[in-house]
């Protein structure tokens, strides 16, 4: 069954590729290697600062296009991510064991409670990174620049482990999430068993709404 349509998958791929480049070049610069080209800078033949700035602009434009052209999807994403249900605490309490056993507590959302928390924190974190990054590009020194630089760094410290965790889960390496990577790759089609394990109510709705053969 199809979890994500083609447009969603391509948007997701474009976002994570730009974010990964930004994280790689950003951490290279944070580590004090501004005078030494990173492998990415060498590949593209440009300084890390220039590459970081250019890809940052690309991410900002990409998000703007996504919001404008995908208003319905954005609305669904926001509504589903901000929805809290009484059983969410129980789901979260069972999650650490479930990632190895696959025995997740039941939930009735489009996203599971862990995804919803991650969505909110990651979107806020990326928004802070993009906003402060644009400010750093437009300003040249001064107290505001110093504050933006500090916030940009701290947002990087927060967002990096979240993205690393997301990649770990989405890769399907953990037993409980085996097969989940197909939701965003190779046509976005999930094995029905995987869908029922991770998003039981969504899978049930999909089966109910599917037209008969």
Model-inferred region functions:
Residues 1-213:
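Membrane-embedded alpha-helical bundles that constitute the cytochrome b-like, heme-associated redox core
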